[in-house]
A protein has these predicted regions:
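N-terminal non-catalytic accessory region
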Residues: 1-153, 157-206
Length: 206
């Protein structure tokens, strides 16, 4: 059993495709209450799963427990979050780390200034987080730093933040953008939504 544990720990520490670190970027929180509710949870909603699927021929609800993709990554592929002893760890982290980009913490007066960051500001902070994560995972290992990549998983406006990071040269350097291996977005308005006559993706080029 100890040998199995050691083997798992070694695999978790190694920078190796497809098990790169994963950064989750949540979507838009409209009201102050939604922001506070968001910042009050460790995973900002990404841990939400389900117990019901509607697949029975007679239309009845079938119970099926799906723990959420984030939890399944921990259970099935030995990923770990970066929380320990009540805080977010910044020292040596395994390659199979799950990180929540907590850009809304700044908007919660309990944690920050109370001012909601713009898409550009959140994207800039995301680039800084990627750099810190590389340093925490790789240290000064030159080969590991060269091999380091991350996956971005984004919901709703989080996808626009990821696009801003990758498409706006004023937000992140080419070195930071090159560390992003893949981006997965869902419910992201890539074609834009009209808010008071302003098309949201236009912010990406500002």
């Amino acid at each position: 059993m100890e040998l199995d544990r050691d083997a798992r720990m070694l695999a978790m520490a190694k920078i190796e495709r497809p098990f790169f670190p994963i950064i989750y970027v949540r979507g838009y929180a409209m009201t102050r209450d939604e922001i506070v509710q968001t910042t009050s949870t460790p995973y900002m909603g990404f841990e939400a799963g389900s117990t019901k699927v509607r697949q029975a021929q007679d239309g009845s609800i079938v119970k099926f427990v799906f723990e959420s993709p984030l939890v399944r990554l921990m259970k099935d592929y030995n990923y770990r979050d970066v929380y320990a002893a009540g805080s977010e760890q910044s020292d040596k982290l395994p390659a199979r780390s799950l990180v929540i980009h907590r850009y809304y913490d700044e908007a919660d007066p309990a944690f920050g200034s109370g001012k909601t960051p713009s898409i550009t500001e959140a994207a800039t902070a995301l680039g800084q987080r990627i750099t810190r994560l590389r340093d925490s995972v790789c240290g000064e290992d030159v080969a590991a730093r060269k091999a380091f990549r991350v996956y971005l998983v984004a919901h709703s406006m989080g996808g626009l933040i990821c696009r801003c990071l990758l498409q706006n040269p004023d937000v992140a350097t080419a070195e930071i953008r090159a560390m992003v291996d893949k981006v997965f977005t869902y419910a992201t308005p890539h074609n834009g939504i009209e808010l008071g006559g302003i098309n949201v993706p236009s912010f990406l080029s500002m």
